[in-house]
């Protein structure tokens, strides 16, 4: 879900939203072995106090909340399952995963109308926010974030999960400056030959945009996440979407040509040879020849980061 972030400096909010009283079921997804105070059990949504709206889209809203007893801050993502059938898949995936490279989900509350995710609060927003603020990403910074994203993708692949929508707005940053993968609304668990095309077109790989030309196989979903990573790291370095020219209208026809037809991606001459090679391996159009996550983690551009 692409969120439209609201202004941080605003008058005190009177939130015209449903009260935090749910008669549905709840399940915790936090690790029972963790001793961190942030994993204090949340028994009910009444344990949380809404502070502000962080963002909202057609499928739901994300709130900044505070635990009434511990004062710990959380993000509360409220979705309507009847408006978006993928949210039940997202809930199932979040129950399975726990990694320091992926945003943490502490609990999910289910009611007749809403699906509510109690999430780790990422204080510095997303990579998309940083790009809008014209933050400059040096090569070492890009290398570090690429390493973290690859670590997260490796974990997901071991769990048999294709993220399916790696893009700047789904890569969140905490107060330590650590980037974590978020939003599993377009994700799927690889089984039964399901190679659907949910996700954001601009970050889709050629085989997802044009299945007839490129074909598909058991690794195609994972290879698509690698392509998306390549687009993201290059976008962070040059400060804009890298597959189209400045001034191009980002419609379907333009994106299709940029992703599937253009011979090569323009990479600035200021990039190091290591960076150019890394991006080239990510943005190989034939998914059969594209580097895997494991191969990229051994690449000199991200190794030992």
From Swiss-Prot:
InterPro entries: Kinase-like_dom_sf, Prot_kinase_dom, Protein_kinase_ATP_BS, Ser/Thr_kinase_AS, Ser_Thr_kinase. Residues 48-302 form the Protein kinase domain. It catalyses: L-seryl-[protein] + ATP = O-phospho-L-seryl-[protein] + ADP + H(+); L-threonyl-[protein] + ATP = O-phospho-L-threonyl-[protein] + ADP + H(+); L-tyrosyl-[protein] + ATP = O-phospho-L-tyrosyl-[protein] + ADP + H(+). The modification Phosphothreonine is found at residue 200. Keywords: ATP-binding, Kinase, Nucleotide-binding, Phosphoprotein, Serine/threonine-protein kinase, Transferase. One of its GO terms (molecular function) is ATP binding. Gene3D superfamilies: Transferase(Phosphotransferase) domain 1 (1.10.510.10). Its EC number is 2.7.12.2. ATP binds at residues 54-62, 77. The keyword NAD does not apply. Pfam families: Pkinase (PF00069). The keyword Transferase applies. It comes from the Eukaryota. The modification Phosphoserine is found at residue 34. The active site is at residue 165. PANTHER family: MITOGEN-ACTIVATED KINASE KINASE KINASE (PTHR24361), MITOGEN-ACTIVATED PROTEIN KINASE KINASE 10 (PTHR24361:SF747). Interacts with P.syringae type III effector HopF2. Belongs to the protein kinase superfamily. STE Ser/Thr protein kinase family. MAP kinase kinase subfamily. This is Mitogen-activated protein kinase kinase 10.
């Amino acid at each position: 879900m692409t969120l439209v972030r609201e202004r941080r400096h605003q008058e005190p909010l009177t939130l015209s939203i449903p009260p935090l009283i749910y008669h549905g079921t709840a399940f915790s997804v936090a690790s029972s072995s963790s001793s961190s105070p942030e994993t204090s059990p949340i028994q009910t949504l009444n344990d949380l106090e809404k502070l502000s709206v962080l963002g909202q889209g057609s499928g739901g809203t994300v709130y900044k909340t505070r635990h009434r007893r511990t004062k710990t801050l959380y993000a509360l993502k409220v979705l309507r399952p009847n408006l978006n059938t993928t949210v039940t898949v997202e809930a199932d995936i979040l129950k399975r995963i726990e990694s320091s490279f992926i945003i943490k989900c502490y609990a999910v509350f289910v009611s007749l109308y809403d699906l509510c995710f109690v999430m780790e609060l990422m204080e510095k927003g997303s990579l998309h926010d940083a790009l809008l603020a014209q933050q400059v990403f040096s090569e070492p910074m890009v290398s570090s974030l690429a390493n973290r994203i690859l670590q997260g993708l490796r974990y997901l692949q071991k769990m048999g999960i294709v993220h399916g929508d790696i893009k700047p707005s789904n890569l969140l940053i905490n107060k330590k400056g650590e980037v974590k993968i978020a939003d599993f609304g377009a994700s799927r668990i690889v089984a039964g030959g399901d190679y659907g095309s949910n996700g954001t077109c601009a970050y889709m790989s050629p085989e997802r945009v044009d299945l007839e030309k490129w074909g598909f196989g058991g690794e195609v979903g994972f290879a698509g996440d690698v392509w998306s990573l390549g687009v993201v790291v290059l976008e962070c370095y040059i400060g804009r979407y890298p597959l189209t020219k400045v001034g191009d209208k980002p419609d379907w026809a333009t994106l299709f040509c940029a992703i599937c037809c253009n011979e090569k991606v323009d990479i600035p001459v200021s990039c190091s040879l290591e960076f150019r090679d890394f991006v080239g391996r990510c943005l190989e159009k034939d998914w059969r020849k594209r580097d895997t996550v494991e191969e990229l983690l051994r690449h000199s551009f991200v190794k030992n980061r």
